[in-house]
Amino acid sequence: MVHVSSFKNDHPLDKRREVAERIRSKYLDRIPVIVEKAPRSDAPDIDKKKYLVPADITVGKFVYEIRKHMTKVSAEKAIYLFVNNTIPPTAALISQIYERYKDEDGFLYITYSGENTFGSDL
């Protein structure tokens, strides 16, 4: 079953496209990204969904930035990003991921999930 973005449900295509085009024309070196938690994920929530990401940062650096916006994330919790149901390479540039996976509205949609990496609490 494919997860449909709540951002897409809340905003019509033409409005999303207009916003993305305005962002891309005003900030040439930035990528408009929507980040949402995967369904049934126990990862912490984030305080915002829309990000204006520098085109030249890596996926790994973006994970670090996402962690800073999470509420109560423990060091043991690994955060995974998914683009089009695939985990992108950590060293890939956001601009590369955008060019390959951007949506028809001009946004890059990223889903995140988490997992405890050092075992569970007993």
Curated annotation (Swiss-Prot):
Q: Which residues cross the membrane?
A: none
Q: Which residues constitute the signal peptide according to the record?
A: none
Q: What is its main location?
A: membrane
Q: Where in the cell is it found?
A: Cytoplasmic vesicle, Autophagosome membrane
Keyword Amino-acid biosynthesis among UniProt keywords: no
Tell me what topology the record assigns in the membrane: Lipid-anchor
Residues cleaved off as propeptide:
120-122
Cite the entry's keywords alphabetically: Autophagy, Cytoplasmic vesicle, Lipoprotein, Membrane, Protein transport, Transport, Ubl conjugation pathway
Give the GO cellular component terms, alphabetically. Answer: autophagosome; autophagosome membrane; cytoplasm; cytoplasmic vesicle; pathogen-containing vacuole
- Note the Pfam families from the entry: ATG8
Please describe the post-translational modifications of this protein: The C-terminal 3 residues of atg8 are removed by atg4 to expose Gly-119 at the C-terminus. This Gly-119 forms then a thioester bond with the 'Cys-563' of atg7 (E1-like activating enzyme) before being transferred to the 'Cys-288' of atg3 (the specific E2 conjugating enzyme), in order to be finally amidated with phosphatidylethanolamine. This lipid modification anchors atg8 to membranes and can be reversed by atg4, releasing soluble atg8.
Question: Which InterPro entries does the UniProt entry name for this protein?
Answer: Atg8-like, Ubiquitin-like_domsf
Site positions (Cleavage): 119-120
Spell out the molecular function terms from Gene Ontology: phosphatidylethanolamine binding
Which family is this protein grouped under? Belongs to the ATG8 family.
The name this protein goes by in its record: Autophagy-related protein 8
- Give the originating organism: Dictyostelium discoideum (Social amoeba)
From which lineage does this chain's organism come?
A: Eukaryota, Amoebozoa, Evosea, Eumycetozoa, Dictyostelia
**Recorded name of the encoding gene:** atg8
